[in-house]
A protein has these predicted regions:
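Charge-rich, intrinsically disordered N-terminal extensions
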Residues: 1-160
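Short, intrinsically disordered, charge-balanced linker/junction segments flanking boundaries
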Residues: 160-170
Length: 170
């Protein structure tokens, strides 16, 4: 059924970077990927704000050139979560230029109190930071480059190793 629907659809003449779902083979840049976990597409439709989506596409295209595709997918996931949060809270923004420190702090409180793990949260924050800083550099939104402070990223919980004597093990 999918093949039939694709067959009857008119061919999309836009460049791959203009589309909301990128076919990585059509980007004409080398992709650093894991051969076991094949990634063929990147889906930007999960970013619900149109202007935000277009800005993020440019940043992600830049990142694809220098980072492994798994890292880029993780960045896209962090932006998707941020976009979902904006919709959930009814925050109306259409550009990364509208993201300010107050909004970021509300989001940080949300992700740190929703019950998910600390490791995932710190990785999400790092990836969100990378994308927003890239958008800031590409579009001249200088406030995005200094939006995050070091204490925004929760420290990873370090495991405590303990040694046991033979007597304790028996």
């Amino acid at each position: 059924l999918k093949r039939f629907l694709r067959f009857i659809q008119p061919e999309d003449m836009r460049t791959e970077r203009e589309k909301d779902i990128w076919d990585l083979k059509k980007l004409d840049i080398p992709i650093q990927e894991n051969p076991i976990y094949k990634t063929e597409t990147l889906d930007f439709t999960v970013i619900l704000q149109e202007g935000l989506r277009e800005e993020v596409k440019q940043a992600i295209f830049l990142h694809i050139k220098y980072e492994k595709i798994a890292t880029v997918k993780r960045e896209l996931t962090s932006i998707r979560k941020f976009s979902g949060y904006l919709v959930e809270k009814g925050v109306k923004i259409n550009s990364c230029a509208d993201v300010d420190r107050d909004l970021l702090e509300e989001y940080l409180i949300h992700i740190n109190t929703n019950g998910s793990s600390g490791r995932g949260n710190s990785d999400d924050i790092l990836k969100l930071r990378a994308v927003l800083e890239s958008v800031g550099k590409l579009y001249g939104y200088s406030h995005l480059e200094s939006l995050f402070i070091n204490t925004d990223i929760p420290p990873e919980v370090q495991p405590v190793f303990r040694s046991y004597s033979d007597a304790e093990l028996m």
